[in-house]
C-alpha cells in the first residue's frame, strides 16, 4: 500500500479511466453540472463518507478539481482513509477540457 498519491497528466488519467479507475470530481455542484469528465462522480463533504464506505479501496482513484490544486489535498485524504492507488489530475478539469473537449459531459450529479 502506498502512503502517497501520484500527480498525473490528463493522458494518464484517461488511460486509467479506460482501464476501470473511478474518477471523482470535488468541484462545486454547479461547476460539475456545467461540465465534467465523462463517467466521473461528484463528491462533496456530504457524500464523501458514503462514497468511502462503498468504495473498493484497492481500485485506482483519480481525483479532479478545477486546476489540480485542491485535488492534491483530497487525494492525500483518500490515502489516509485507506485507498491504496490514488491520483491527482494535474491541471484539473480545465486542462482535461482543453485536451479532451469531446470527453466531457454536463448535467447534475447522480
From Swiss-Prot:
Keywords: Cytoplasm, Transferase
Enzyme Commission number(s): 2.8.1.1
Record carries keyword Disulfide bond: no
GO terms under biological process: glycerol metabolic process
A Gene Ontology term for the protein's cellular component: cytoplasm
Main location: cytoplasm
PANTHER family, alphabetized: FAD-DEPENDENT OXIDOREDUCTASE (PTHR43031), THIOSULFATE SULFURTRANSFERASE GLPE (PTHR43031:SF6)
Listed name of the protein: Thiosulfate sulfurtransferase GlpE
Protein species of origin: Pseudomonas aeruginosa (strain LESB58)
Lineage: Bacteria, Pseudomonadati, Pseudomonadota, Gammaproteobacteria, Pseudomonadales
Gene name of this polypeptide: glpE
Amino acid at each position: 500500500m502506498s502512503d502517497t498519491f501520484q500527480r498525473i497528466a490528463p493522458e494518464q488519467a484517461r488511460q486509467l479511466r479506460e482501464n476501470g479507475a473511478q474518477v471523482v470530481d470535488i468541484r462545486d455542484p454547479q461547476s460539475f453540472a456545467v461540465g465534467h469528465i465523462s463517467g466521473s462522480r461528484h463528491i462533496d463533504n456530504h457524500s464523501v463518507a458514503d462514497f468511502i464506505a462503498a468504495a473498493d479501496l484497492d481500485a485506482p482513484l483519480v481525483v479532479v478539481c478545477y486546476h489540480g490544486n485542491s485535488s492534491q489535498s483530497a487525494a492525500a485524504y483518500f490515502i489516509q482513509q485507506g485507498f491504496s492507488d490514488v491520483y491527482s489530475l494535474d491541471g484539473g478539469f480545465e486542462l482535461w477540457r482543453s485536451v479532451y473537449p469531446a470527453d466531457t459531459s454536463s448535467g447534475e450529479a447522480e
